[in-house]
């Protein structure tokens, strides 16, 4: 039987212009130092009493934020790896997922925001501090408002232009808000731990210079010896503020500015300095700045992460420095969408929206553990090759042995959302146990923007987000603008060091910011459940199939001697005792002594398995069901023509690559495949073997001439005798 797949190849003529670029620099001392301008601003409560309080702009929703600053497109069309799909894509797609807990709390911070909303917020011990565009507001821990929505002008005066970042300095129990100025940056910290009743120490934009450039896209981090800020500027793109003095409202607090050497960009850039997640600080110095480097950009030979180390001497700035960077090799990635432009992801209606490319997303987070330090970060990538486009989240955990030691890549992954939806606009952090939580935006051409989350336990297989996706909020309208969010923000609750608070933008029906809180770490002492049926799997099956399941300990205590059961369709329930011990967050397998009959060809079976622990405190995650098919033995098909793809400079010797899928259960070898173009057919033999229920890519030895401009249709097929 012949089964065919078609691919339409369109040859395009595109003119490529060369750009000139400066030479790479060296490690540097500060390029700029200055004492910050200081003022004290009364509390929100006092401002309301004396009539000086400035509320949030009631007409903010009518306004459009500043355009993103583009410093020349430095993307080289056709340059860089991977040549195919993201190399980590299939690891995530084949992940065995565990159930995730439902959101704990969901609430909106604003329904009155300009475009985009610039959502940011951090959870403190007593309040959630939210900000957007040019406003901010404090919320009680139950999501109810604790203060009126306030204009940033009530702290900074008229010289502020939005792009706020809200921070909480857990070590000193203070709340921080920042914003852009006309040619500088604003910074304010609460005088005490009650940001509504306490006043504010404000450091003004007039002395926070960016060398005359607009301080686009500022991103802040807390480190032991300073508050660090990166900006999307062509030079003077890193700043450090004197944390110890700022905490005390010292008018002599200073700032040091740097040019990060050897930072190559696509024309828009946002590096991140590591932000300390909790109040366990490393020793002062050796702050780390990270930026991705895509080999699709000019002057970047391979995909990698670039690492800078910053050391500050507040007594003598001549001793301060930013290092020459070192590189961490990564799996290849494509961070470029639409040649570097901002209109990327297709909605069901309205304009394509910004995927937020070339950005290490807010924030890159640091956490100390007894045996090592960890850092987590992410950025958006295009996970599919050719003209197909799928936004996914490339994420990393870096580790160092002790403070100040070199970083290494401990794990990396590419997270894709289910159902072919985009995943982008992510923010992530680690909890006290080393579990990773990640919030993100998702959408497709048929589904509106939603806010969701996933994560992984510390002991899970590396490179995988193992928790089932969960929903925070679903938009009921599309985005009327190309601009979307610009960034998102996830923080960890300091009260338990476990609960994640995520905020981003959605539409209900207008533009709004939505907070969702969720937790991965256990709140229960005893909580176990089946997370997968490991065998049998779909294929050629018998009347005596061995049943093996995986059991996960969600709880904090070690458990043993509990019952585990399975049921085939509506048949008898088989129950056995697992006599081993399972530690917290450990996964174990159990193989039943009783087999299952799955012998009827073409039948879909369901096996459901579950645990029974008398002291289990959460029964919602006890069971898992799996559908298993007894496959026909012989069933092959071509499922994709993956190359060549439409583009420029196609040659007379283009290789033709197809994907062949074995839908059957029997291994296949020495079968024929063909491709046909304009009446000419090429047939070759695939030696195999191709295992049942699997795929392979086959590259034809006879190439294809696509050197003439035009449109070509490629039809590919496979022939297998006795194909069912």
Which ranges hold each PLM region?
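Intrinsically disordered, low-complexity Ser/Thr/Pro-rich tracts
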Residues: 5, 9, 211-212, 531
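C-terminal PAP-associated
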Residues: 23-523
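Bacterial Sec-dependent N-terminal signal peptides
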Residues: 1-26, 608
